[in-house]
A protein has these predicted regions:
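Conserved Nudix-box catalytic region and its N-terminal flanking loop in Nudix hydrolases
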Residues: 24-63
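Acidic, metal-coordinating catalytic segment for phosphate/diphosphate chemistry
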Residues: 1-16
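Nudix hydrolase/Nudix homology domain
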Residues: 35-39, 109-158
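Conserved S-adenosyl-L-methionine
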Residues: 72-76
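Unchanged
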Residues: 47-70, 80-133
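A cytosolic small-molecule/anion-sensing beta-strand core signal
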Residues: 21
């Protein structure tokens, strides 16, 4: 069994963080089961049974990046469908953070199965040169639409 099997053949709820600071967004370069090469994604991960989406995001962000988030506001709902994967992703804007950015790890994986390659604040201007997923985020960030107050829904299927 490979390390991506737990994510397939079910609907997975993920909580993700959009931490923007001085025209840059915090991103994690990591392996994902639907791509052949690593991608840049906002920090986040699965919501456990009985865990709130906000608490899941705070836990995942701390594990992956060393950063603690606060002042969370739901901004995007993204539905991702690519058989055998199906995820509902909740993207929260964070207005405050504490801690130093580090390359963290995922306690669900052994040391040899770690997915994270790099963690950094990436300038908006550099996003089009990177493999950022979900793809809608690049336009939302560069256009400033991420600052709007309503919750927006996006769907990606391949």
């Amino acid at each position: 069994m490979n390390s991506v099997d737990p994510y397939s053949n079910k609907v997975r709820v993920r909580s993700c963080g959009l931490l923007i600071f001085e025209g840059k967004i915090l991103l994690v370069k990591q392996n994902v089961p639907t791509r052949m090469s690593p991608v840049w994604i906002p920090p986040g991960g699965g919501v456990a049974l009985g865990e709130s989406a906000e608490l899941a995001l705070k836990r995942e962000c701390k594990e992956e990046t060393g950063v603690s988030l606060s002042g969370l506001r739901l901004r995007y709902v993204h539905e991702f469908i690519e058989k055998p994967y199906h995820a509902l992703e909740l993207y929260f804007l964070a207005d405050r953070f504490s801690g130093e950015v580090i390359k963290g790890s995922d306690p669900e994986h052994t040391q040899s199965e770690q997915l994270i390659h790099e963690v950094c604040f990436m300038p908006f201007d550099d996003l089009t040169m990177l493999n950022v997923v979900p793809e809608f985020l690049v336009d939302e960030l560069k256009s400033g639409r991420y600052l709007q107050s309503q919750i927006s829904y996006f769907k990606s299927d391949r």
